[in-house]
């Protein structure tokens, strides 16, 4: 007999799935993606970047009856350090927990700031696209090595422009005193 805890079935990640089917709920999906599977991430990475992503997710019913995509996304990709302009590896670990919304649904019970993913017109979840969205949202705007020797030197030497400028309103004060 099953207890109150239901064992999660584990499966490979499909290309697409209907998250609202009962058989999709409470099942653990696992797999890996490369740059070939994530074209937008490949485009946002330097040429020849090595992209490896490991994903595990479940579809579960939330407290308000909504279907939630709960994922663990871990991986790494090449980036260019914006301080020294040398290649670097960017490691990431993401744990999105997002309500899935049908195209014709607008559940107000979730609240305005609840994170949600509106599914396409077909009503299907495309896991690779959802994973790619999360990685692109987490991608650093200006990636940098943690210990980067660049940036410690001054590009310009102190010069004439660094001296303290005279107050332009001092002349007005002098004129006011004369009247």
Residue locations for each model-derived region?
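Residue-level signal for pocket-adjacent positions within structured domains
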Residues: 33-36, 83, 112-114, 120
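Short Cys/His-based metal-binding microdomains
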Residues: 86
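Charge-rich, low-complexity linker and terminal segments
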Residues: 1-28, 52, 89-179
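A positional/architectural concept
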Residues: 2-78
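The −1 position to Zn-ligating cysteines in a subset of zinc-ribbon hairpins
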Residues: 80-83, 147
């Amino acid at each position: 007999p099953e207890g109150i805890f239901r064992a999660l079935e584990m499966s490979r990640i499909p290309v697409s799935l209907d998250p609202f089917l009962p058989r999709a709920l409470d099942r653990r999906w696992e797999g890996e993606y490369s740059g070939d599977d994530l074209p937008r991430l490949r485009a946002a990475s330097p040429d020849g970047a090595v992209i490896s992503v490991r994903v595990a997710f479940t579809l579960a019913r939330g407290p308000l009856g909504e279907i939630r995509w709960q994922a663990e996304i871990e991986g790494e990709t090449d980036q260019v350090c914006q301080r020294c302009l040398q290649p670097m590896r960017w490691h990431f670990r993401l744990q999105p927990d997002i309500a899935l919304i049908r195209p014709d649904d607008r559940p107000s019970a979730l609240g305005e700031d609840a994170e949600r993913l509106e599914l396409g017109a077909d009503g299907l979840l495309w896991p690779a696209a959802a994973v790619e969205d999360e990685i692109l949202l987490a991608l650093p705007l200006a990636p940098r090595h943690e210990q980067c020797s660049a940036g410690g030197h001054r590009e310009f030497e102190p010069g004439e422009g660094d001296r303290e400028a005279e107050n332009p309103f001092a002349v007005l004060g002098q004129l006011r005193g004369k009247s």
